[in-house]
Design a protein with these regions (language model features):
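Bacterial N-terminal signal peptides that target proteins for export
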Residues: 1-10
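Core hydrophobic alpha-helical transmembrane segments of single-pass membrane proteins
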Residues: 12-17
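N-terminal signal peptide c-region/cleavage motif recognized by signal peptidases
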Residues: 19-21
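Gly/Pro-rich, tryptophan- and cysteine-flecked surface segments typical
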Residues: 23-171
Length: 171
């Protein structure tokens, strides 16, 4: 009798757990709205996002479109889950206006040697996180950088890979 109670309890617990799903980060988190006038699209996924020990992550994106768009940089923790910043909250939290033909830089924080058009406010340390680059235009090219925060001529600056819609180059 005790075995059937325990086994019934385990089945109930398994059913309860099966009904809850955890977000896996940039792969399945809901895409937020970053504009009242156009739909938001996931353009790129960025692994290796760091905001720690004097290193910041920046994305530099250029519009190839003939109309203005909105651009956003959404950061995720190493363990996945929902985004660490709310890009739907507007400028100052990883979202910028992207005029036609313009280039904009969004960073996890300020750095002496790199110009940022916007930084993500109130973002804590991120060690080996990830990100999504979102826009209201699909005609946007981006690159990513890891940059030393304090150097006017950064001793550390390197590009990071950015993947179009979860695919690496050559896939």
């Amino acid at each position: 009798m005790n075995a059937s109670i325990i086994s019934g309890g385990l089945v109930s617990a398994a059913i309860a757990l099966a009904g809850t799903t955890a977000l896996a980060g940039p792969g399945d988190s809901p895409v937020p709205s970053i504009s009242a006038f156009a739909s938001t699209r996931v353009l790129y996924t960025v692994p290796g996002v760091i905001k720690n020990n004097g290193i910041e992550t920046a994305i530099i994106c250029t519009s190839l479109d003939t109309v203005a768009a909105t651009l956003a940089f959404e950061v995720f923790a190493p363990e996945g889950g929902g985004p660490l910043n709310d890009v739907s909250a507007g400028v100052g939290n990883g979202t910028v206006a992207l005029p036609a033909g313009a280039t904009e830089t969004i960073s996890t924080g300020t750095s002496v040697g790199l110009h940022e058009d916007a930084t993500i406010s109130a973002l804590g340390n991120v060690k080996n996180g990830s990100a999504r680059i979102l826009s209201t235009s699909t005609r946007v090219l981006c690159t990513g950088l890891l940059v030393e925060k304090l150097g006017s001529t950064p001793a550390t600056i390197t590009t990071i890979k950015i993947f179009a819609r979860r695919k690496q180059n050559g896939d």
